[in-house]
From Swiss-Prot:
Keywords: Membrane, Photosynthesis, Photosystem I, Thylakoid, Transmembrane, Transmembrane helix. It comes from Nostoc sp. (strain PCC 7120 / SAG 25.82 / UTEX 2576). Gene3D superfamilies: Photosystem I PsaL, reaction centre subunit XI. The gene is psaL. This is Photosystem I reaction center subunit XI. It is found in: Cellular thylakoid membrane. The chain crosses the membrane at residues 92-112, 142-162. InterPro entries: PSI_PsaL, PSI_PsaL_sf, PSI_suXI. NCBIfam families: PRK00704.1-4. It comes from the Bacteria.
Amino acid sequence: MAQAVDASKNLPSDPRNREVVFPAGRDPQWGNLETPVNASPLVKWFINNLPAYRPGLTPFRRGLEVGMAHGYFLFGPFAKLGPLRDAANANLAGLLGAIGLVVLFTLALSLYANSNPPTALASVTVPNPPDAFQSKEGWNNFASAFLIGGIGGAVVAYFLTSNLALIQGLVG
């Protein structure tokens, strides 16, 4: 086995000797690397379809979508894994915990918006960053929509979890 590895070092046609990591755009001054993962069409498609990078969305719509997702998935760990998981009102505790964390995230976003953040740079994965995050107003719109969406997502998760028996009875 060691012989095969040693012998492959001298064969340029061996796939193990091909470079797969390059500087982005073949320019080492960018300070970014183009790998088979971040340069693949599937990863580029996925990243560019996330709400933060999808073209044509306003900052408010971006914040609403991101907030709904965060509020929805933050509810579960607070309700089902928190210290009140065995209590009768575990779902309410999960709702309040998720809303509290969304409020803290919104405060952090507002602080970041008021710190004059740098403009987004083009990268291998996102060659055209959106204009939504170029101004303080865009970031503040994103933060306020994040709060609304986050609370809404947590309330939807609370409603679905609290009324699971009713929903199962309606569906089947």
